[in-house]
Amino acid sequence: MARNKPLGKKLRLAAALRSNRNPPVWVVAKTKRRVVRSPARRHWRRVKLKA
């Protein structure tokens, strides 16, 4: 990918990077491990973004 990106694409990629995280530890503790993984997780090689 190009080093110089348009601002809109850069913001979309940054939002996708932020959303691609595990739920916080306090959420796992509060729900008694009912919530342990995020359904929105994405692997960089398997699922490509439409950004």
UniProtKB/Swiss-Prot annotation:
Annotated Pfam families: Ribosomal_L39
GO biological process terms, semicolon-separated: translation
CC terms in the record's Gene Ontology section: ribonucleoprotein complex; ribosome
Highest taxon of the lineage: Archaea
Signal peptide annotation: none
GO molecular function ontology, one term from the record: structural constituent of ribosome
InterPro entries from the UniProt entry: Ribosomal_eL39 (IPR000077), Ribosomal_eL39_CS (IPR020083), Ribosomal_eL39_dom_sf (IPR023626)
Keywords: Ribonucleoprotein, Ribosomal protein
HAMAP family documented for this protein: Ribosomal_eL39 (MF_00629)
Family indicated by similarity: Belongs to the eukaryotic ribosomal protein eL39 family.
Protein name: Large ribosomal subunit protein eL39
Native species: Pyrobaculum neutrophilum (strain DSM 2338 / JCM 9278 / NBRC 100436 / V24Sta)
